[in-house]
Structures are given as structure tokens and as C-alpha cells.
From Swiss-Prot:
Keyword Secreted appears in the UniProt entry: yes
Protein name: Locustatachykinin-2
Primary site of residence: secreted
Protein's cellular compartments: Secreted
Residue positions where Arginine amide is found in the record: R10
Organism: Locusta migratoria
Physiological role: Myoactive peptide. Stimulates the contraction of the oviduct and foregut.
Length: 10
């Protein structure tokens, strides 16, 4: 699951 921001998934 990605973060609440933008770079949750890198």
C-alpha cells in the first residue's frame, strides 16, 4: 500500500 503522499510507491 502506497503512502498518503506521492512517492509512496517507488
Amino acid at each position: 500500500a502506497p503512502l498518503s503522499g506521492f512517492y509512496g510507491v517507488r
